[in-house]
Every structure is written in structure tokens, then in C-alpha cells.
């Protein structure tokens, strides 16, 4: 069994009491998800998340301590993929999308993001992020 690890983040911002999440439309598979990507040799999970967020969105973020969610699935026979998501507040709103991988990026509230997110495990990570932010 081949194991792969990707890392990324639930990126959010707060506007007038509303929590908005950034969801991205990935060109590979044409699906909506979060900023994430494969770890490179020697990188920590957080380092991978920072690099992927920068590459895919151009955003600088501040990570919220204490939030780490992992999902596991098999994208193909003989492959087990783990994706680790952190929670990160955007320091700005201007997106510079990596057009080779990302065709669109939008800021939406939880309900709208759940209608677009393609994988139910990722939708559950968004729900947990919202609950975490509300508890603050």
C-alpha cells in the first residue's frame, strides 16, 4: 500500500460578524475543495500548508492553534491518502490564484460552501472549523 500525505487549511475571514470560507475550484477533477497539496521532502505539515496556501492563493495567513483535522481515503487501488487541514485566518482578501491548478476561488458562508464542496469529508472539516470559530 502506497501512502501519501497532503496538507492545507480551512482559510477564513470575518466580516460584519459573518464567517466566510475560501473554497477553490481545482482544475484537476474540476471540483471544489480547500487549499492543499502534497508534502515535499523534509517539510513539516505546517510548512506544507503555508507553501500550498501561498502557491494556490497568494494569501498570507495566521494559523489558529489547536485545530488540526485529518481525513483519509483511497483515491485509487493500493493508495491511501491522508489530508491534514489546519485553520487559518486570511491576512487580506486579494487572491492571486495559481491558474495551472485553480480555476476559481470564492469567499462563502458555511451553508453555501457545503453546496459546492465535492467531498463529504471535506465538508465535515468545514463544519468543525465553523464550530471551532463559534466557540472562541
Set out the residue ranges of the language-model regions.
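Conserved N-terminal beta-strand and adjoining loop/helix that marks the start
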Residues: 1-20
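Short polar/acidic secondary-structure junctions
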Residues: 14-16, 26, 76
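Active-site segment of metal-dependent pyrophosphate-handling enzymes
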Residues: 58-94
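Short helix-loop capping/hinge motifs at secondary-structure junctions, enriched
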Residues: 17-18, 93-96
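Short, well-ordered beta-strand micro-motif
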Residues: 11, 23, 87-89
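NUDIX/MutT-family hydrolases
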Residues: 96-129
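Conserved Nudix-box catalytic region and its N-terminal flanking loop in Nudix hydrolases
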Residues: 18-60
